[in-house]
Amino acid sequence: PPPPPPPPPPPPPPSPPPPPPPTTPRWYRRRQRQMCIRDRLKEASESQEFRNIFSGSSILPNSNPYAMCYGGHQFGNWAGQLGDGRAINLAEVEHSGQQWALQLKGAGETPYSRTADGLAVLRSSIREYLCSEAMFHLGVPTTRALSLMLSGDQVLRDVMYDGNPAHEKGAIVCRVAPSFIRFGNFEILAAQEDKATLTALVDHTIKHHYSHLGKPSKGTYLKFFKEVAVRSMDMVIHWQRVGFVHGVMNTDNMSILGLTIDYGPYGWLEDYDRGWTPNTTDRTNKRYRYGTQPQIVLWNLLQLANALFPLIEEAALLQDILKEYQQEVDIAYLEMMKSKLGLFEKDKNDKILITELENSLELSETDMTIFFRQLGNFKSDGSQDGLELVSKAFYNEKEIVKEIEAKWKTWFLKYAERLQKELKNDTERSESMNTVNPKYVLRNYMAQL
């Protein structure tokens, strides 16, 4: 006789009760022009009900807020199951034909909080609010911030990690994005060998966010992976353009839509240093330093490829896409740097010119943002002193000793010669450069006040 069927799996453990509501929630900042608070919702945002929902005090009717389970590779090692430890997905809304997910960060404990309290403080919440909006307006793919609320509660945090915790003001940010699905959502299912749920998640993601790729099939899954790679490459090239350093590029912090997500220990390059990272816990190995970010994206894509392999079952096809990324990211980086220099015509020596510039920028403390913005005023006829033009970018002009000065003058001579091959005049070139070289970035000291 056939063996008896296996016993049914045990029921899942009960979810913990919802976190207690904030004591006295009130608005700290809200974007009335944002995609979700406008027109008829603008008036609603003044209501007590609206404040209750966006502080986590109450939920929308007929909604079922949830926290997501995901895994991830952290600093190059598999960390197992992780999940939304202090993020709660409120709902998804549609506005002007676009789907938006609303997520609260800091509203309290979730099933994945482990030993943490699920809360956030005003200091880190302001950092996330400001940076996500700054990135959006600099043209960088990113999640956005809809609102920032004070909870009215005090939250205990050890800011300096020195064993002296202190109470800070609690706060809650509402994040907005088409989706908050991460690489880690796929990784955990592959690790659990749950092919059915993995397939369902991939199909859901394609249906709602990559529907142009067609109906689910092995070919569609490959096209999906390739487009995720392209979007991720576009994101990281923009990071390099504006000097943004994420700081914690674990696979659980990689958006499946190619958006910048999770603004934690981020920072902006001030003096140009390809080895810099803002993450103090990464200061020894500097895995996530500025100069390696494009390669870290490739490594993370490899982990996503491993997670998707059960649906494709041909490693060579996935490897081909990863090889394409390596080739294309080098080209994309070169084109991005050329745009920062106002170079639009092809020249076989451009890569050498850019490498020499990057090396010169590291000879002394040179402010990246100021340097490239000032460079837009350079005259192609070589009639001005390039070093004097960018002198505001040097933190200490006394560091510009004769050897460094000579290297800079040599580079500016080559740059002036190269500009002679361009079709745009100085005014047109300057205008083009100013569209990619920001005048202002969110300076680290401002974000840490």
Region spans (language model):
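TRNA-binding/sensing appendages of the translation machinery
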Residues: 1, 26-29, 38-59, 102, ...
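Single conserved hydrophobic/aromatic residue that forms the stacking wall/gate
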Residues: 2-33, 37
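Conserved ATP-binding subdomain of kinase catalytic cores across diverse folds
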Residues: 32-33, 55-213, 300, 443
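ATP-dependent phospho-/nucleotidyl transfer catalytic cores
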Residues: 124-125, 155-158, 162-246, 257-352
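Catalytic-loop Lys-Pro-X-Asn motif of eukaryotic-like protein kinases
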Residues: 251
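Helix-loop elements that line ligand-binding/catalytic pockets
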Residues: 315-437, 444
